[in-house]
């Protein structure tokens, strides 16, 4: 399993870090077998797996449940788990308790928190308590209502300057990596140059230290539209739809099951079942 030290070395040697989301056992198993460097159990599971309109309804229990499944599927991969909405805002005591639960109960290697400002103190407290933290700046889905929707962040000089300063604050507070979402490539590149910790982009251009995408977006599974920054590497949804249609047709036409899918009794046992009389 790669560690924080490995990711820092990858940054220094200019080797891109590959991160991918996973939410269950089979997806995690495939991700690990493929050789991803890091798995993110994102609160995006609320929209991708649970069918919510946003990440807001996702709970700590949800994150623990799904991370446990991912850990079973990927026992040798570094796993980062999202701290869900309001799980680290009400009080420092509650934030620490929730982080403790995720680390102890789920098998995660680190937690991820969104934003800077007051969140910097959370990063500092988690780090002091021995909880590795990945920071997340730019488009932060838990704050999408405040941000005015799913929009690119840091497009003007003032907001870009704040992004750069916030990134530095996150690093100073102890973050081991930084996710940059939906920010101009120039700003992401500048942040990457100024930080010693790895940056992982999602819609942040090609001059960051790594990339992360949502599993279902990459595979074209269960999603009708994907963001501009996504490259679809397959269309699993079409394959699944075709397979299910064939299954339904075979059952309706009594073409499934075939002989190769059935179990049979020996003739004498079948006869003995009814006392030597055939039915």
From Swiss-Prot:
Binding site for Mg(2+): 43, 82, 114
InterPro entries in UniProt: Pantoate_hydroxy_MeTrfase, Pyrv/PenolPyrv_kinase-like_dom, Pyrv_kinase-like_dom_sf
A Pfam family assignment: Pantoate_transf
CC per GO annotation: cytoplasm
Keyword presence, Metal-binding: yes
Cofactor: how and how many bound: Binds 1 Mg(2+) ion per subunit.
GO biological process: pantothenate biosynthetic process
Assembly and oligomerization: Homodecamer; pentamer of dimers.
This protein's name: 3-methyl-2-oxobutanoate hydroxymethyltransferase
Organism of this sequence: Geobacillus sp. (strain WCH70)
